[in-house]
C-alpha cells in the first residue's frame, strides 16, 4: 500500500473496530486487518505472493482490457475458496454485458467461485 496505514489500523483495532482494506496487491498489506480484498489491475494483474493466501476476496473491474484468459489466470492464482468477483465498470452497459458474458463462460468452463457484483459506490454516484 502506498499510504502508511499501520498506526491507523492499530488504533482502530484498539478501539474495537474491525478493519477491511482493499488493495491492488502490488505491495504488502498492514498486519491486523480483518478482511483483505485484492483488486489487481491490468495489464499484468500483479499480486504480491504474500497476499494470495490472505485475501478474503478478489475483485476484477470489467474493463475493456479484461479478457477471459486474464480471469482464468487470476482465478488460478488464488485458492478456490477465495471468491473472484467480476464488477462492471460503473453502470456502463457494455461493461455489464461483458461481465455477464465472462461469468457465463467461466461457468461453462467449470471455473469455481466466480461471482458478479456491482460497484455500489458507482451506482449511488459516491465519489
Question: Language-model segments: what does each one mean?
Answer:
Residues 1-127:
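Conserved AdoMet/S-adenosylmethionine-binding subsite of the radical SAM
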